[in-house]
Amino acid sequence: MNEFDARLLEGKKRLHFVGIGGSGMFPIVQILHAAGYTITGSDVNEGDIINYERAMGIDVKIPHAAENVEGADLLVYTAAILPGNPEIGRAQELGIPCVERSVMLGYVQRLYAKSICVSGTHGKTTTTGMITQVLEMAGKDPAAVIGGKLPLIHGYGKAGKGENIVVESCEFSNTFLHLSPDTSILLNIDADHLDFFKTMENLKASFRKFAELTQRRIIANGDDANTVETLAGIGREVVTFGQTEGCDYIAKNIRMVRPAFYGYEVWHRGERLAEVTLSVPGKHNVYNSMAAFVASTLAGCTAAEAVRGIDAFTGTGRRFEVLGHTACGATVADDYAHHPTELEATLSAAKQMGFERVIAVVQPFTYSRTKLLLKEFARVLQIADQVVMSEIMGSRETNDAFNIYTADLAALIPGSVWFPGFDGIVDYIEKNAKKGDLVITLGCGDIYKAAKRMIV
């Protein structure tokens, strides 16, 4: 990983963003725009984020074109930008420096006196959103970079005037190694992105490097064996949370307060600090909210302020987000879950909510993940009453090296059906879903588009 360049924006006035309509770009754009830089950008399609950016006075061009970069001092691009992009090519011809989004995120994070960087295979977006909500409701005006839309701030992040920034920190391609957290959070470490990391040891080594970048304090899940092993002998202050004795902060007396929603007490060194009642479903959110409670109180919030923000948190976009109803009255929801651990947590919560049936509409994401975890996918998807699937979304991969298809997964799930496109899925739901059912689309690709077509 390259060393941080503190002079990255020295003498720079106009910053051009390629892929400016992406949710990961938007908070960075907001922060740098508020800092006084002239921002321009481009993307391939119009969208809500671009509408917001234009309302801020930002010049956004559709589509990408070489002339868009003329006069820029620096170009920022997302990892989704394909080789041969005309704007990057023209920038290189003109000698305009080009940096990937994660590099700029590392720079932006350092603009704030204190940073809370949230890492982990699962739960990053929810936990980042919770912490942001607590700090915002406590009047601390944090900056934030979140992977999902947080209703309280009407977006994926914000440029705060306070001393804190809360950053969702992704391990894929080692992008979180550009950060320098004041406080880092390790929620869990699970087998994912092995197309990049190849082995669990490499994955854990990456998280270890991230933890070693921490300047002040590491907040870690003391119940997660991989996390505990990764942090052994780290030489930093480590504060643990969990549900077992031995953790610094312990969730006790966990109970279901209504179907799929949990409450619990927070204890610290024998003292009962608070009682939390979650407004997001699923027992897995006990861990996410414990991390948020610890981070928020150590950032200067009172226990009461932490509880107020956590209790009021109803989720972020694409995290068990209820979208509406079908013509027959079935409830339609959407969730980003795309790993067996996440699917198991989401479907288990859904089954507790009192619906007649849970119909899981799944878009497997990447050939490598599907092949590696095929049996685990088959096991957890059978939690649902009915499984409907699309073809695998390859994203950055081609199937030549993997030879895996949705039909292979469907063969392991009795009664499941699959369709090559969304038309077949939507038609199937229209004909088979009934009032009292929950239809939940699952995946980190574009399966949400099918969900939106189902609702009236």
Predicted regions and their residues:
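A glycine-rich beta-strand to alpha-helix segment
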Residues: 424-455
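C-terminal helical cap/extension that packs against the catalytic core
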Residues: 260, 378-435
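Phosphate-binding loop of NTP-binding sites
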Residues: 6-8, 31-34, 54, 68, ...
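N-terminal leader/targeting and accessory segments in enzymes
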Residues: 1-100, 104, 225, 252, ...
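Short internal beta-strands
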Residues: 37-44, 217-222, 359-363, 384-394
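Nucleotide phosphate-binding/pyrophosphate-handling subdomain across enzymes
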Residues: 3, 8-16, 24, 31, ...
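Beta-strand->loop->alpha-helix junctions that form or flank phosphate-binding loops
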Residues: 42-43, 61-64, 99-106, 145-146, ...
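Short acidic/histidine-rich motifs immediately flanking catalytic phosphotransfer sites
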Residues: 69-74, 163, 435-437
